Curated annotation (Swiss-Prot):
GO process terms (BP): regulation of DNA-templated transcription
InterPro entries, sorted: KRAB (IPR001909), KRAB_dom_sf (IPR036051), SCAN_dom (IPR003309), SCAN_sf (IPR038269), Znf_C2H2_sf (IPR036236), Znf_C2H2_type (IPR013087)
One term under GO cellular component: nucleus
Protein name as catalogued: Zinc finger protein 18
Gene3D superfamilies per UniProt: 6.10.140.140, Classic Zinc Finger, DNA breaking-rejoining enzymes
Localisation per UniProt entry: Nucleus
Ranges of residues in domain KRAB: 218-291
Keywords for the protein's UniProt record, in alphabetical order: DNA-binding, Metal-binding, Nucleus, Repeat, Transcription, Transcription regulation, Zinc, Zinc-finger
Gene name in the database record: Znf18
Family label: Belongs to the krueppel C2H2-type zinc-finger protein family.
Coiled coil: none
PANTHER family in the cross-refs: ZINC FINGER AND SCAN DOMAIN-CONTAINING, ZINC FINGER PROTEIN 18
Length: 556
């Protein structure tokens, strides 16, 4: 079954109508569009949850779109499985290869694998297709010496499926001077404060000079607009690298726009109107990355959802995919925090930094170092997932505490004892702890006049006077005044000895007996006579010794 450019290349312009479509039989035009499995697939993959519609209606529409795409009444289970596997395989391909393979319309996963493997022996085929099919540049076939696949076409115009007619107010973007330019940029906000070396004119379109000699020598002149070779020679290597990445991103934007908008191809010989919008976008193979803007005028319901399709071309997809549980669609986007341009990680928490990036729309770095983190601009932290970012954040906080820095604001607000500095989660815990310093007691026994801090201790003490033993052993029926005593007794019946000495492997039922046994190996003598200073390992030995000073019993 034919597969189009797919979800990784941006949302469809008629997506705004997809959620409210009723698919009535009276709308013949819309029925014809939805009869196309590829159109139904795009609608299914890019469908968004609407709070006003409710979960039941949303599930109904989603089920209908899924049936229109997979067509279970026509396809077998094996064919449906093959469609799903093909979709996932194409989704995880690098951006440039994915564009080319999708254009060949593979019918199965094996056909897609064959197309990808064909590029290994003939890498020029990909760049020839980009120049001829996407840019419309005329490159002599003999010069490229290519062997094309049966599905490889060399016509300068792309053949596209007919799309739904969308009114201007239904377009996903507003406030645009050029509707086509806005659709190509897929919601990328113009940046007025971009760095000078990144704000290059479209006429300075470079090819990579060192790493791709074949591509530069054979396609460098053809890719550049006319009469711009002189400007190209004056660019340094960094500018050429940056603009080559921008050019590849432009290809993806244009192919995505053509696949879902119309069959007209915009003239890219003058990219000045798209230059600022496309600066900062990242594609597979890019080693330099500028700022990653987010859409400023996003609808309110998009803030409640993680709309992956609107962020797919902005490099921040890995972070959102981690939150939503969906796998990153492209290998290129998984390198968002790559080695070539590691992003700065500031003092904000991960949720705060993510919220700032999603809501501000200022084009700032995802984790800017300027936000009170104390890090210098040159200090970078590399990461590839949200979990690694969290680990790095915790490591930063741990290092800060080791250096003697002040506690976090949250720790400063917790109840703290002024006497010993202990911190508690509740004020009630602090109040109870302070009684240990003041000696204040609330529970007094009227029989022996003993006082207790805890009510539980007071209740246990009263049972010594009343003889109450509410805790009964299930094995022998013996009663105990508290549950802890019952637990120790039950271990006699079960033979459980959880405390084992690592030196002599002797086991004990109670922790207290285990602690006393360890003194045999360590030689510890915690009990000291106040008269002569002699020390003992056991309290019973100290009692016998003290009697010798009182004259009751000679010292053993």
């Amino acid at each position: 079954m034919p597969v189009d450019l797919g979800q990784a290349l941006g949302p469809l312009p008629f997506l705004a109508k997809a959620e409210d479509a009723t698919f009535s039989a009276s709308d013949a035009t819309q029925q014809r569009e939805l009869a196309n499995p590829e159109t139904a697939r795009q609608l299914f993959r890019q469908f968004r949850y609407q709070v006003l519609s409710g979960p039941q209606e949303t599930l109904r529409q989603l089920r209908k779109l899924c049936f229109q795409w997979l067509r279970p009444e026509v396809h077998t289970k094996e064919q449906i499985l093959e469609l799903l596997m093909l979709e996932q395989f194409l989704t995880i391909l690098p951006g440039e290869i994915q564009m080319w393979v999708r254009k060949q319309c593979p019918g199965s996963g094996q056909e897609a694998v064959t197309l990808v493997e064909s590029l290994k022996g003939e890498p020029q085929k990909l760049w020839h297709w980009i120049s001829t099919q996407v840019l419309g540049q005329e490159i002599p076939f003999e010069k490229e010496n290519l062997t094309h696949c049966p599905g490889d076409k060399l016509e300068p115009a792309l053949e596209v499926e007919p799309s739904l007619e969308v009114a201007p107010q239904d377009l996903p973007l507003q406030n645009s001077s050029s509707a086509t330019g806005e659709l190509l940029s897929h919601g990328v906000k113009e940046e007025s404060d971009m760095e000078p070396e990144l704000a290059l004119a479209a006429s300075q379109l470079p090819a990579r000079p060192e790493e791709r000699p074949v591509r530069d020598q054979e396609l460098g002149t053809a890719v550049l607009p006319p009469l711009q070779e002189e400007q190209w020679r004056h660019l340094d290597s960094t500018q050429k690298e940056q603009y080559w990445d921008l050019m590849l991103e432009t290809y993806g934007k244009m192919v995505s726009g053509v696949a879902g908008i119309s069959n007209s191809k915009p003239d890219l010989t003058n990219l000045a109107e798209y230059g600022e919008e496309l600066v900062g976008l990242h594609l597979h193979g890019a080693e330099k990355m500028a700022r990653l803007p987010c859409k400023e005028d996003r609808q309110e319901n998009d803030k409640e959802n993680l709309n992956l399709e609107n962020h797919r071309d902005q490099g921040c997809l890995d972070v959102f995919c981690q939150a939503s549980g969906e796998a990153p669609p492209q290998t290129a986007l998984s390198d968002f925090f790559g080695e070539s341009e590691p992003h700065r990680f500031g003092g904000d928490s991960v949720p705060e930094a993510l919220e700032n990036h999603q809501g501000e729309g200022t084009g700032a770095h995802l984790f800017p170092y300027e936000r009170g983190s104390g890090k210098q601009p040159g200090q970078h932290i590399q990461s590839s997932s949200l979990g690694e970012l969290t680990a790095l954040w915790l490591e930063e906080k741990r290092e800060a505490s080791q250096k003697g820095q002040a506690r976090s604001p949250m720790a400063q607000k917790l109840p703290t004892c002024r006497e010993c500095g202990k911190t508690f989660y509740r004020n009630s815990q602090l109040v109870f702890h302070q009684r240990t310093h003041t000696g204040e007691t609330y529970f007094h026994c009227h029989i022996c006049k003993k006082a207790f801090l805890r009510s539980s201790d007071f209740v246990k003490h009263q049972r010594t006077h009343t003889g109450e033993k509410p805790c009964k052993c299930d094995y022998c029926g013996k009663g105990f005044s508290d549950f802890s005593g019952l637990r120790h007794h039950e271990k006699i019946h079960t033979g459980e000895k959880p405390y084992k000495c690592p030196l002599c492997e002797k086991s004990f039922i109670q922790r207290s007996n285990f602690n006393r046994h360890q003194r045999v190996h360590t030689g510890e003598k915690p009990y000291k006579c106040t008269h002569c200073g002699k020390q003992f390992s056991w309290s019973s030995s100290l009692d016998k010794h003290q009697r010798s000073h009182l004259g009751k019993m000679p010292c053993p």
